Each structure stands twice: as structure tokens, then as C-alpha cells.
């Protein structure tokens, strides 16, 4: 007869399993983005985690051109506005519990963080 399966043991094994984690950082402010990515890399180095990055993805430039005058009278002058969106990708290979500790840092306002876990 087989021994009953211990649920705690199964949960611990699943938690210690190494996952591929991708952290995507997006912001319009480069300095804040670099600070957050440096903090994540620094924390990953403390736990001796296999890491790749931060990989700098191409900057998206959103442009809008509008007429200066609201009624169409006068000379045809235009205003051009643009917003630059910067993106960084960091790949980690670690257990999920360790990644929770790494990502519990203070994230500066204006920086969006997306964490995806692959088995």
C-alpha cells in the first residue's frame, strides 16, 4: 500500500521549481525606468539568480500634429506633440518565492511593471 500524499510537501516542491520569469518595465521617463531596472538587477544579484537584461527595446514615438488656430482663420500654423515610450525587459530564472522577494521593491510613479511566468 502506498503512503498518503502530503499536500505540504507537494506545495513546497512546486514552489521550489525553477520558473522562467519575464519582467517588462514601461515608462515615459527614462531615469525612473533605469532606477527601477537597476534595483531589480541588484536584488537579483543578492539572491544569486540567473538573469538576462535589462534589454532595451525600441522606443515608441507617438506623434500628434494639430492646427494652432481653432477656427481655420489666419496663417496655417501647426503644433507637433510627441510622447516617447521606453521599454526594458529583464529575464530571470528562479523559484516563484524568490521572485516575490525581488519584486517587492518601491517602484517609482510612472513606471509600469508587468511580470509573466512561464513553466
Swiss-Prot record:
Organism the protein comes from: Candida albicans (strain SC5314 / ATCC MYA-2876)
Biological process terms in GO annotation: translation
Compartments it resides in: Cytoplasm
Residues that span the membrane, as ranges: none
InterPro entries: Ribosomal_uS10 (IPR001848), Ribosomal_uS10_CS (IPR018268), Ribosomal_uS10_dom (IPR027486), Ribosomal_uS10_dom_sf (IPR036838), Ribosomal_uS10_euk/arc (IPR005729)
Subunit record text: Component of the small ribosomal subunit. Mature ribosomes consist of a small (40S) and a large (60S) subunit. The 40S subunit contains about 32 different proteins and 1 molecule of RNA (18S). The 60S subunit contains 45 different proteins and 3 molecules of RNA (25S, 5.8S and 5S).
Disulphides: none
Primary gene name: RPS20
Protein family according to the UniProt entry: Belongs to the universal ribosomal protein uS10 family.
Name assigned to this protein: Small ribosomal subunit protein uS10
A Pfam family this chain is assigned to: Ribosomal_S10
Keyword Cytoplasm (UniProt): yes
Predominant subcellular localization, coarse grouping: cytoplasm
Entry keyword set: Cytoplasm, Ribonucleoprotein, Ribosomal protein
GO terms, molecular function: RNA binding; structural constituent of ribosome
Coiled coil: none
Amino acid at each position: 500500500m502506498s503512503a498518503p500524499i502530503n499536500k505540504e510537501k507537494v506545495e513546497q516542491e512546486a514552489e521550489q521549481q525553477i520558473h522562467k520569469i519575464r519582467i517588462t518595465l514601461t515608462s515615459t521617463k527614462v531615469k525612473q525606468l533605469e532606477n527601477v531596472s537597476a534595483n531589480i538587477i541588484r536584488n537579483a544579484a543578492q539572491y544569486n539568480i540567473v538573469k538576462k537584461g535589462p534589454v532595451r527595446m525600441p522606443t515608441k514615438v507617438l506623434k500628434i500634429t494639430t492646427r494652432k488656430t481653432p477656427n481655420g482663420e489666419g496663417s496655417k500654423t501647426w503644433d507637433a506633440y510627441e510622447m516617447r515610450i521606453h521599454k526594458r525587459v529583464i529575464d530571470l530564472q528562479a523559484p516563484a518565492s524568490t521572485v516575490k522577494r525581488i519584486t517587492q521593491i518601491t517602484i517609482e510613479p510612472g513606471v509600469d511593471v508587468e511580470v509573466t511566468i512561464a513553466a
